[in-house]
């Protein structure tokens, strides 16, 4: 990389975050400018509407880039294979933890009897978010997608909903690690959600090297975070000259092996 690019990158890092939302600006050689936003896929009523300054950034951008277009994609888990009884797929301790959390969330355990383990984990996580007052229509990426449509902006998917489902279907042991991590780090997950909400409601991180609680096993982190960051990095590096607003899950912006570090 040329010296001028390195100087610009260092200067941007020294300036720190000057936005009222979690975001990092990255400029790549070839006049490519990315405004990376730490999105939350479900948000609270207080997180709408989006900041005026952010909407102006979108207006001045050439395109909006998201993980998947959740405004049009059918992400319902239809036509999934039926699994054997839950008691035959998880151990006694995991079953007891699942029953306890299901009762706490007001979910009938029978709902999970033949669902894939990764799907059970995602249903639990979504229900937990709802209990904290979060709704999909207030999610940051959903609001950005609606604004992009109003502004007639192109929308580019980093992976798309269908590829996300394929990735989940290919998890080792049919997603056992994802369910186990969800059960084990249940209360930590709730605190992490509240922390990410505060980045939008109160103040974003001022230090891009913040330490976040680890709620994934290493093998799962590699699949759900590291490998996806690598794929997204390659896709962003291949973009033509222009200005882009990029919305990815907030955890992809901070912590170990984050997307901005890979792009720099």
Go through the PLM ranges and name each one.
Residues 3-11, 20-216, 220:
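Structured, acidic catalytic/metal-binding patches in enzyme active sites
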Residues 16, 47, 137, 225-229:
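A conditional alpha-helix N-cap/helix-loop micro-motif detector
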Residues 222-264:
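A cross-kingdom marker for long, charged
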């Amino acid at each position: 990389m040329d010296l001028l690019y390195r100087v610009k990158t260092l200067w941007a890092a020294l300036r720190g975050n000057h936005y009222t939302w979690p975001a990092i600006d990255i400029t790549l050689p070839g006049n490519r400018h990315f405004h990376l936003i730490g999105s939350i896929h479900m948000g609270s009523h207080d997180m709408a509407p989006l900041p005026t300054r952010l909407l102006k950034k979108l207006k001045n951008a050439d395109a909006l880039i998201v993980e998947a277009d959740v405004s049009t994609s059918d992400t319902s888990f239809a036509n999934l294979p039926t699994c054997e009884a839950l008691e035959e797929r998880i151990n006694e301790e995991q079953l007891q933890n699942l029953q306890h959390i299901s009762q706490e969330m007001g979910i009938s355990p029978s709902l999970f009897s033949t669902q894939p383990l990764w799907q059970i984990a995602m249903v639990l996580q979504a229900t937990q978010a709802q209990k904290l007052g979060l709704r999909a229509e207030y999610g940051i990426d959903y609001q950005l997608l609606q604004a992009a449509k109003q502004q007639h902006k192109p929308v580019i998917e980093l992976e798309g909903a269908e590829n996300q489902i394929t990735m989940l279907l290919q998890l080792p042991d049919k997603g056992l690690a994802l369910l186990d991590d969800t059960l084990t780090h249940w209360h930590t997950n709730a605190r992490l959600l509240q922390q990410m909400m505060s980045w939008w409601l109160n103040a974003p991180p001022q230090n891009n090297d913040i330490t976040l609680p680890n709620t994934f096993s290493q093998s799962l982190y590699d699949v759900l975070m590291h490998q996806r960051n690598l794929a997204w990095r390659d896709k962003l590096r291949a973009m033509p000259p222009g200005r882009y607003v990029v919305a990815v899950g907030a955890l992809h912006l901070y912590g170990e092996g984050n997307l901005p570090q890979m792009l720099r």
